[in-house]
């Protein structure tokens, strides 16, 4: 099964692409945002760790019903980089475990492809398990405009803090196999999606062969090794600049 890593900066249109892949092409979606909400529900281990770490920093961390005040938590961590790293350190292991379980489920169901929809695909090194990576991008001006329209409660400073906390568009493009430019119309975006799907669709023969241990192991190993090599080359290039 081909795992397609889908990522993109905030308010670039990744969710639009994910819905199109699900509705038009019937691809199963492993949604990291959805999983991230589930693992921080009251009673979950990640929830307890977040409360312990942030309760003295964010007075309104919890809502009346005991759930996390996601707006207050987000505003805080996007203004405090070290705390954003701490939050990611708490949530990422739980999110990874849940994602791997879901990917395994779709593999056993016999799907030819599944989409791993992750905002921090490269930051979390999850691209290493993907056969193909796709990034959705747009201009920073359009990104800011869309973010403030989608989240009117954010000030311009808060919105810019969220954008600046993420990987740059240039780095994301350099690490992606395919780029979807979302600066124009929805029709244009859909045409780009159609083109990418046609290029990456695995054959039925390959899908069947991957259920045989030798072929499956070689296929998986080649993906991981190629991703690690690509990352190593990119790190060398960055160091040389």
Curated annotation (Swiss-Prot):
Catalytic activity from the UniProt record: 3'-dephospho-CoA + ATP = ADP + CoA + H(+)
InterPro entries the record matches: Depp_CoAkinase (IPR001977), P-loop_NTPase (IPR027417)
Binding site for ATP: 8-15
Subcellular location: Endoplasmic reticulum; Mitochondrion; Nucleus
Pathway info: Cofactor biosynthesis; coenzyme A biosynthesis; CoA from (R)-pantothenate: step 5/5
The DPCK domain, residue ranges: 3-211
Disruption phenotype: Lethal.
Keywords from the named record: ATP-binding, Coenzyme A biosynthesis, Endoplasmic reticulum, Kinase, Mitochondrion, Nucleotide-binding, Nucleus, Transferase
Recorded coiled-coil stretches: none
Role according to the record: Catalyzes the phosphorylation of the 3'-hydroxyl group of dephosphocoenzyme A to form coenzyme A.
Family per record: Belongs to the CoaE family.
Protein name, UniProt field: Dephospho-CoA kinase CAB5
Gene: CAB5
């Amino acid at each position: 099964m081909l795992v397609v890593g889908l990522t993109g900066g905030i308010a670039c249109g990744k969710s639009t692409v994910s819905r199109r892949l699900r509705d038009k092409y019937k691809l199963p979606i492993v949604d990291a945002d959805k999983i991230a909400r589930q693992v921080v529900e009251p009673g979950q281990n990640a929830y307890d760790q977040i409360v312990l770490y942030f309760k003295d920093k964010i007075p309104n961390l919890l809502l009346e019903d005991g759930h996390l005040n996601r707006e207050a938590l987000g505003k805080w961590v996007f203004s405090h980089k070290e705390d954003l790293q701490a939050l990611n350190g708490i949530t990422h292991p739980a999110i990874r475990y849940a994602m791997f379980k879901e990917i395994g489920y779709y593999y056993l169901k016999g799907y030819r492809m599944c989409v791993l929809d992750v905002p921090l695909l490269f930051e979390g090194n999850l691209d290493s398990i993907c056969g193909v990576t796709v990034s959705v991008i747009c201009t920073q001006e359009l990104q800011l405009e869309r973010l403030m329209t989608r989240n009117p409660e954010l000030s311009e400073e808060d919105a810019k803090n969220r954008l600046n906390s993420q990987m740059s568009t240039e780095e994301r493009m350099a690490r992606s196999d395919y780029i979807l430019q979302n600066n124009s119309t929805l029709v244009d975006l859909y045409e780009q999606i159609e083109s990418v799907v046609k290029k990456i669709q695995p054959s039925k023969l390959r899908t069947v062969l991957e259920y045989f241990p030798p072929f499956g192991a070689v296929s998986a190993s080649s993906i991981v090794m190629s991703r690690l090599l690509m990352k190593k080359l990119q790190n060398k290039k960055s160091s040389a600049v």
